[in-house]
Amino acid sequence: MQRDMLQLTNRSVRTSDDFTQLAPLLINTDGFIEMTRVGWRNPLRHRRSEMQRVSYRLDDEKLVRGYWHTLDRGYDAEPAFQILLEEVEQVEFYVLDTQGEEHKFWPPQLQSGQAADPAAIILRIEIVPFGVVERIWQVPNVNFLGGQLNSNLTGGQPNAPL
C-alpha cells in the first residue's frame, strides 16, 4: 500500500466510451480509493506501461486491493483482486490538500473552479483487535489540479463490484 501511495502520478484513465476520463485520484466515503501509480515492475519485459491503476476498499470485513492489467479501460477490463487484511471494521481515506483542508471526496466538488492539489493521503482503518490505526503518506509533488478543476475528469463509476 505504501508503495502505491508514494508512487501516485497525475494520469487520468480513459474509459471504454471514449468520452469519460477517471481522475488520477478518486476517493469516496465508502472506504474506497482509486489511483494511478508509476513504477509497476516488469522483469519479464512485457509490452505494457509502467503505470498501473490500483484501488483499495473494504469488502466483507476485508481490505482488498484491486489492480488492472491495462491503464485505459476497454469494455472487458476487469480488475484482479488481492485480500490484504481481514477482520477490518472500517476503512476511510481522505486527502489533505496543499491549503490544509481535509477532503472525504476527491476530486473536490467546488463551485468556484479553484482547488488546491493533494499534499497527503490519510488512511484511518479500524482493525480487530487493535482499534483505529492512522497512516499518512505525503504524495509526490505532482501538479494534479493546477488550481483549476478539469471539467473533463469525473468520479464516474471507478470500480466494478466484487
Predicted regions and their residues:
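A short, polar/proline- and glycine-enriched secondary-structure boundary/capping micro-motif
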Residues: 45-47, 73-82, 134-135, 145-148
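Short beta-strand-initiation
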Residues: 20-21, 49-51, 79, 88, ...
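Generic detection of short hydrophobic beta-strand segments and adjacent strand-loop junctions
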Residues: 56, 82-84, 135-139
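Short linear sequence signals and composition-biased patches located at protein termini or domain-edge surfaces
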Residues: 92-162
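Sterically constrained small-residue positions within well-ordered secondary structures
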Residues: 26, 47, 84, 114, ...
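Structured surface patches comprising rigid loops and adjacent beta-strands/short helices at the edges
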Residues: 82-95
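Extracytoplasmic beta-strand-rich oligomerization domains located immediately C-terminal to a leader/signal peptide
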Residues: 2-74
